[in-house]
Amino acid sequence: MSTKRLALAGIIAAALTLTACTGTGAPDPTGSASETPTPTSTAGTKVPPPASEDEAISAAESVLTDYFTTRGEVNAAGGADPSPLEALATGKALDVAVNDAAYVAEGPVLNVDQVNVDGPATTEGAIKYETVTAYGQPWEEVENGLVTINACQDASEYKVFASDGSEALRPDPRSTFDYQVIYDSERETWLVYDLISLGESC
């Protein structure tokens, strides 16, 4: 089932080969500590298995957006507490998000001059992605329990800065991904499972 949707998701990720980009909104460096966003879980209530492919795709896109938004909140708050992501992700997608949070919290950051700068990162901007196609397939005896969302991810408006203010080196800001979202029968909820870089610009 094909869908077209432009989604804005504030996220951060380390410059990892898997994710191919990073993203989040940053706290205002001139603002007080009270202005820094507090991470909040956007996980919904328990839901039954999908009744159709359309329903599965809609649920998968919703949790994917929540996942990216929560990553942004976690990292904008300093990356020290990635626990809100556990309600939205599992497997490799959770590992990527936790590693991104650690990157933000601890550094070092490789800057555009290819110098590693110690200390935590700060970020600004947000990542956009556009769904190209999406489809469901069986997962652990649940019809349409696995949704693959093929998308163009655009991180051109997102920037990461090292602790000295220099901009971080980053890969191609526009690249193709297959996002995989699963229905977890035990938890009765949708979880982002994998972020697969296809290695192509878009």
Predicted segment positions?
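Bacterial N-terminal signal peptides that target proteins for export
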Residues: 1-10
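Solvent-exposed, flexible loop/coil residues
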Residues: 5, 78, 162
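C-terminal motif of bacterial Sec signal peptides marking the signal peptidase cleavage site
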Residues: 17-20
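Bacterial signal peptide processing site
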Residues: 22-25
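Extracellular mucin-like PTS domains
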Residues: 30-46
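Core segments of small alpha/beta cavity-forming domains
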Residues: 44-120
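Structured, amphipathic secondary-structure segments that form assembly/contact surfaces
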Residues: 87-178, 182-202
